[in-house]
From Swiss-Prot:
Ubiquitously expressed, with highest levels in kidney, brain and testis. It holds the Pfam family WD40. PANTHER family: 26S PROTEASOME REGULATORY SUBUNIT RPN14, MITOCHONDRIAL DIVISION PROTEIN 1-RELATED. Belongs to the WD repeat PAAF1/RPN14 family. GO terms for cellular component: cytosol; proteasome complex; SAGA complex; transcription factor TFIID complex. WD repeats lie at residues 82-121, 125-163, 167-205, 209-259, 270-308, 313-349, 353-389. Transmembrane segments: none annotated. Keywords: Acetylation, Host-virus interaction, Proteasome, Repeat, WD repeat. The keyword Transport does not apply. The gene is PAAF1. The keyword Repeat applies. This is Proteasomal ATPase-associated factor 1. It comes from Homo sapiens (Human). The modification N-acetylalanine is found at residue 2.
Length: 392
């Protein structure tokens, strides 16, 4: 992958005034970094600044919310996107997780201020406060219906909430350590949780009961993903007949991102190991790109792309900085990744440039969610940022 380009986090404000400047840099692996600047030469009648770049950099295109820059010497090209809107009043401290409902109307987020809130996705207006976890909430997500929320906390509890009246309808107990991530199986009759206690569990929402321990790996499970398996993949057979309360687990894979540098893939119904991959550092997050391709991100900044059919060697390893990879999300023909140094970027196969979501100034971007052409991020600086993409 080409050398990463970086830009001043508030470039859009800085270049809005005459002679305003913003710094730029290019970081080719194993070579000295290149540094430069952008300068505003004036504002056009359409409100778009006229911007020139210092030697070694080229401005390909600019509008109010985006600027496309190249560094020809390193064959690097990035389109930087400024937030369309920023929501600063949802939380008062670092926001650890967020999700957007399937119809795009609502957002849910959790914060180190001790709260979990539901808000209007269009303007950040507060709708509901979800109270009931003891200690911090680590993860929250909407069910496919968009009317119900699943959350996991440091109190080792998993809870299901009504987004309409903020009532907690189900509490799952059984984990012995904080819950770090969750996944929803199919339409949501079953859910999966991953915990610091080293186990992943399958739950029956209707009866609020544990259907079984899917894996017990003796190491904290930081991230989990469920995906439909390509029919060429052997998922193994269950040792005992699955419960009739298990719904939608067949032909599904379960991916576990583990603290002990291991990425584990299982048949969700069979509980049988499909592969175990050892990475360079603790795995923080993982996602499926297709029925056989997956991504997983590590604490030392590596993004591994693996093929389940031949998982011994990665298809590719993307490394843009040594900052921890904190979230990965599949999008059309590619993926979005966020890291602990504030970078958040989109790689799409059909584009010869990387799209960078700017605004966070070296603060970790913990989670990314999308709805149609909109991307939402949450950050340690306590802000939710919404970006508008022309094509996603």
């Amino acid at each position: 992958m080409a050398a990463p380009l970086r830009i001043q986090s508030d470039w859009a404000q800085a270049l809005r005034k005459d002679e305003g400047e913003a710094w730029l840099s290019c970081h080719p692996p194993g070579k000295p970094s290149l540094y430069g600047s952008l300068t505003c030469q004036g504002i056009g009648l359409d409100g778009i600044p006229e911007v020139t770049a210092s030697e070694g950099f080229t401005v390909n295109e600019i509008n109010k919310k985006s600027i496309h820059i190249s560094c020809p010497k390193e064959n690097a090209s990035s389109k930087f996107l400024a937030p369309y809107t920023t929501f600063s009043r949802i939380h008062t401290k670092s926001i650890t997780c967020l999700d957007i409902s399937s119809r795009g109307g609502l957002g849910v987020s959790s914060s180190t201020d001790g709260t979990m809130k539901i808000w209007q996705a269009s303007n950040g207006e507060l709708r509901r406060v979800l109270e009931g976890h003891v200690f911090d909430v680590n993860c929250c997500r909407f069910f496919p219906s968009g009317l119900v929320v699943l959350s996991g906390g440091m109190d080792a509890q998993l809870k299901i909430w009504s987004a309409e009246d903020a009532s907690c309808v189900v509490t799952f107990k059984g984990h012995k350590g904080g819950i770090l991530d969750t996944a929803i199986v199919d339409r949501g009759r079953n859910v999966v949780s991953a915990s610091r206690d080293g186990t992943a569990r399958l739950w029956d929402c209707g009866r609020s009961a544990c259907l079984g321990v899917l894996a017990d790996c003796g190491s904290s499970i930081n991230g989990v993903a469920v995906g439909a398996a390509d029919n060429s993949i052997n998922l193994g057979s269950p040792e005992q007949m699955p419960s009739e309360r298990e719904v939608g687990t067949e032909a599904k894979m379960l991916l576990l991102a583990r603290e002990d540098k291991k990425l584990q893939c299982l048949g969700l119904q069979s509980r049988q190991l499909v592969f175990l991959f050892i990475g360079s550092d603790a795995f923080n997050c993982c996602t499926f790109l297709s029925g056989f391709l997956l991504l997983a991100g590590t604490q030392d900044g590596n993004i591994y792309q693996l093929d389940v059919r031949s998982p011994r060697a990665p298809v590719q390893v993307i490394h843009r900085s040594g900052a921890p990879v904190l979230s990965l999300l599949s999008v059309r023909d590619g993926f979005i990744a966020s890291q602990g140094d504030g970078s958040c970027f989109i790689v799409q196969q059909d584009l010869d440039y990387v799209t960078e979501l700017t605004g966070a100034d070296c603060d970790p971007v913990y989670k990314v969610a999308t709805w149609e052409k909109q991307i939402y991020t949450c950050c340690r600086d306590g802000l939710v940022r919404r970006y508008q993409l022309s094509d996603l």
